[in-house]
Amino acid sequence: MRPTLLWSLLLLLGVFAAAAAAPPDPLSQLPAPQHPKIRLYNAEQVLSWEPVALSNSTRPVVYQVQFKYTDSKWFTADIMSIGVNCTQITATECDFTAASPSAGFPMDFNVTLRLRAELGALHSAWVTMPWFQHYRNVTVGPPENIEVTPGEGSLIIRFSSPFDIADTSTAFFCYYVHYWEKGGIQQVKGPFRSNSISLDNLKPSRVYCLQVQAQLLWNKSNIFRVGHLSNISCYETMADASTELQQVILISVGTFSLLSVLAGACFFLVLKYRGLIKYWFHTPPSIPLQIEEYLKDPTQPILEALDKDSSPKDDVWDSVSIISFPEKEQEDVLQTL
């Protein structure tokens, strides 16, 4: 029994040695793609890698992507399985959500991807990436379509979520608002489940700046993914009724005071410079038309011109009585005087 056992051991060692010394499969001598990475931003699911460069081949290298779920077999990433074609492609990117944001892998599934390069009958070794779950590993962006409506001492904020969640019982968004009076201290209000938030008790007619932030909560694994802040935007609150009334009163009083000052200044100037003002507004004397014509044409008799132009209404005379005395009576009267 011992010689038989010894020969069996020697035979097994020979087989292992032959297998170890055998050259690798020539069909798998293609370099593998380098630095593959999966991008999970909002609803996006994109796999990218660096291209395989070959100096001795003019044919393009193509790539094949496969995926698997927990305890499942490997599937080829094609139209039938995932909705996009990532088989025999020359691109160095596979966008699983290219068809629509709702496409791609289920966000709560455990997904593993692998990738290899191919050139004719040659292919590289598979490059397997670590598994991921979208809700666990996603980068959440800021809320979108932010609209702010100023109110009386308030700001009403409306927006949409970073991406749609099919089943809100397993995962949902809550929101926070970071706001501050311009030049003041920042405050945070939240969390809110609603996509409409009202900031109340703000000072009227003041400028406030704000940023909105989303946070993803996955109930199944009790995971929180804090999102990015939105861009800073500033708005001025409206004045309330009492403030508007005060402004109207102040404007009215200011206008009346200004008009009073202007009226007083004008009256003072009129008194001080009345002679000059009278001189400015006095109508200069004019020569009668008949005399002006006579000066232009001295040969024209002035009296005839006046008689010609005068109207009958202007020919008015007083009655004149001529009393004559005899020469003797006239001397007596003179002596009496």
Swiss-Prot record:
Annotated ranges, domain Fibronectin type-III: 31-129, 142-240
Gene name per UniProt: IFNGR2
Motif (Dileucine internalization motif): 276-277
Record protein name field: Interferon gamma receptor 2
Function in brief: Associates with IFNGR1 to form a receptor for the cytokine interferon gamma (IFNG). Ligand binding stimulates activation of the JAK/STAT signaling pathway. Required for signal transduction in contrast to other receptor subunit responsible for ligand binding.
Native organism: Homo sapiens (Human)
Cell location: Cell membrane; Cytoplasmic vesicle membrane; Golgi apparatus membrane; Endoplasmic reticulum membrane
Residues annotated as glycosylated: 56, 85, 110, 137, 219, 231
Record's signal peptide: 1-21
Gene Ontology CC annotations of this record: cytoplasmic vesicle membrane; endoplasmic reticulum; endoplasmic reticulum membrane; Golgi membrane; plasma membrane
Membrane topology term: Single-pass type I membrane protein
PANTHER family: INTERFERON GAMMA RECEPTOR 2 (PTHR20859:SF46), INTERFERON/INTERLEUKIN RECEPTOR (PTHR20859)
Highest taxon in the source lineage: Eukaryota
Subunit structure: Heterodimer with IFNGR1, to form the IFNG receptor complex. Interacts (via intracellular domain) with JAK2.
Stored Pfam families: Interfer-bind, Tissue_fac
TM region(s), chain numbering: 248-268
Cytoplasmic side: 269-337
Metal-binding listed as a keyword: no
Gene3D superfamilies associated with the record: Immunoglobulins
